[in-house]
């Protein structure tokens, strides 16, 4: 049994009191029709050199799947008013030294998926994640990539496309179950948070809400555990995290949303009035 499997099985028993859902093997993924590319993105000399030196630069203990994503994925660099200024590898975007020295900021998104009972789907990040392993967070948190389909600004379509892609990658939710026009982008926030001495986040984060009943089949390379929570169960989870019980931790971006926005937005979810909460003109610096 691999180290990843042992860590994964060990963590599955940590929070059963919250009604955790079992992890099932991910389904076979259907082929995805890519949008025709009119935008041609060439690798910079820096990116090529990084790829060549990947084996030397990467931590020896980094999981192979996470290593591939760290070097292959190109994040979208933006300024503090969300204008695209370039692109960089996921690896470099999450190195705390580069974040601090170059103020490197990239675009991200956080999905909050509710079922028809208005329960919020949470995930615990896998033990092999490079940043914030084994922390509990909202449904899905990731980055649009520097590709034509995820750079579309109109109606925030690029970010919606990225959210749909990652819900399949991480949670096995097919694209047809989460249509892009069902996502409601509510606002944006800008935050910075260290993960450990080497890694961290500096993101301009799009906050996307969606209400759908979906079948979830988590990918164990990305997700250790999932659970649906109502408001009271989330409060209990927060209390345990604040008290440090059972080693429970929450992601910093999720906690920022919980503390600043989630209660009032949850009200709108229950009332069916999410459109009234939309404020995409603001970028909240937290």
Curated annotation (Swiss-Prot):
* Gene3D superfamilies in UniProt: Nucleoside Triphosphate Pyrophosphohydrolase (3.90.79.10)
Q: Name one GO biological process term.
A: photosynthesis
InterPro entries with a match to the protein in the record: IsopentenylPP_isomerase_typ1, NUDIX_hydrolase-like_dom_sf, NUDIX_hydrolase_dom
CDD domains tied to this protein: NUDIX_IPP_Isomerase
Sorted alphabetically, which keywords does the UniProt record give? Answer: Chlorophyll biosynthesis, Isomerase, Isoprene biosynthesis, Photosynthesis
Q: Which GO terms describe its cellular component?
A: cytoplasm
By its UniProt entry, which PROSITE patterns does this protein fall under? Answer: NUDIX (PS51462)
The chemistry this enzyme catalyses reads: isopentenyl diphosphate = dimethylallyl diphosphate
Q: Which residues act catalytically here?
A: 141, 203
Q: Give the transmembrane ranges.
A: none
Instruction: Please name the pathway.
Output: Isoprenoid biosynthesis; dimethylallyl diphosphate biosynthesis; dimethylallyl diphosphate from isopentenyl diphosphate: step 1/1; Porphyrin-containing compound metabolism; chlorophyll biosynthesis
A GO molecular function annotation here is: isopentenyl-diphosphate delta-isomerase activity
Residue intervals of the Nudix hydrolase domain: 104-256
- E.C. code: 5.3.3.2
Q: What does this protein do?
A: Catalyzes the 1,3-allylic rearrangement of the homoallylic substrate isopentenyl (IPP) to its highly electrophilic allylic isomer, dimethylallyl diphosphate (DMAPP).
The UniProt entry, under PANTHER family, shows:
ISOPENTENYL-DIPHOSPHATE DELTA-ISOMERASE
**Similarity annotation:** Belongs to the IPP isomerase type 1 family.
The protein's name? Isopentenyl-diphosphate Delta-isomerase II
Q: Which organism is it from?
A: Clarkia breweri (Fairy fans)
């Amino acid at each position: 049994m691999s180290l990843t499997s042992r860590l994964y099985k060990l963590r599955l028993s940590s929070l059963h009191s919250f009604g955790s859902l079992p992890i099932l093997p991910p389904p076979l993924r259907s082929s995805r029709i890519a949008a025709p590319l009119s935008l041609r993105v060439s690798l910079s000399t820096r990116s090529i050199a990084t790829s060549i030196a990947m084996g030397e630069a990467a931590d020896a203990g980094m999981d192979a799947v996470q290593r591939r994503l760290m070097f292959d994925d190109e994040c979208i660099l933006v300024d503090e008013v969300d204008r695209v200024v370039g692109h960089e590898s996921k690896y470099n975007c999450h190195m705390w030294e580069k974040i601090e020295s170059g103020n490197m900021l990239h675009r991200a998104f956080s999905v909050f998926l509710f079922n028809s009972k208005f329960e919020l789907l949470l995930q615990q990040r896998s033990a092999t994640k490079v940043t914030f392993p084994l922390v509990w967070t909202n449904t899905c948190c990731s980055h649009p990539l520097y590709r034509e389909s995820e750079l579309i600004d109109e109606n925030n379509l690029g970010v919606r496309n990225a959210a749909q892609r990652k819900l399949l990658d991480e949670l096995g939710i097919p694209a047809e179950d989460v249509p892009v026009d069902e996502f409601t982008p509510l606002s944006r926030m800008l935050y910075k948070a260290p993960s450990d001495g080497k890694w961290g986040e500096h993101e301009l984060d799009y906050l996307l809400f969606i209400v759908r009943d979906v079948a979830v089949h988590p990918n164990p390379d990305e997700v250790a555990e999932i659970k649906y929570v109502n408001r009271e169960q989330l409060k209990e989870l927060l209390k345990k995290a604040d008290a440090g019980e059972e080693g429970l931790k929450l992601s910093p971006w999720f906690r920022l949303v919980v503390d600043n926005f989630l209660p009032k937005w949850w009200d709108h979810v229950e009332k069916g009035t999410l459109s009234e909460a939309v404020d995409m003109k603001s970028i909240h610096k937290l």
